[in-house]
Amino acid sequence: MVNDESSLLYWCHKNNVPIFVPGITDGSFGSQVWMYWQEHRNLHMDLFQDEQDLMDMVFDAKESGAIMIGGGISKHHTIWWNQFRGGLDHAVYLTTAEEYDGSLSGARVREAVSWGKVKAAADYMTVEGDATITLPIIVSAVLERMDSE
């Protein structure tokens, strides 16, 4: 049960906002989930249903937008399904990755525009900086703006 009001998970649960973690079985977190599962076999994850749910949300949306924190699998997962609906309408990348090495993590929004993963007419921006600093500043500014409207 999620009952900590200072938790993002709490508020997502309370407001029926889904959270998708495409790489949940990857790395140290995945091994921790696996170890937990050894003693709690009633834990089930349906990654294919997650894919279906995410795809349904993307295709059913009148507009699609995303804040992508970091790069790699979570960023790619978000932009991937959106290319099949003509691209994201709104996109914000928060990244510390460099562009010069050709990695997906370092690719700027204009690269996703060139592939149709973000619409050319979309509102988009890349914010270069540590997300533990930039995300709270962005959230604070959005909340302040919402309060004034």
Each language-model region and where it sits:
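Internal active-site segments that recognize and position negatively charged phosphoryl groups
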Residues: 1-58, 64
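General beta-strand structural signal in soluble alpha/beta enzymes
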Residues: 19-23, 69, 93
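Gly/Ser/Thr-rich loops at beta-strand to alpha-helix junctions
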Residues: 25-27, 70-76
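A short linear-motif detector with a strong N-terminal bias
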Residues: 45-48, 69-73
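C-terminal functional extensions of proteins
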Residues: 63, 73-149
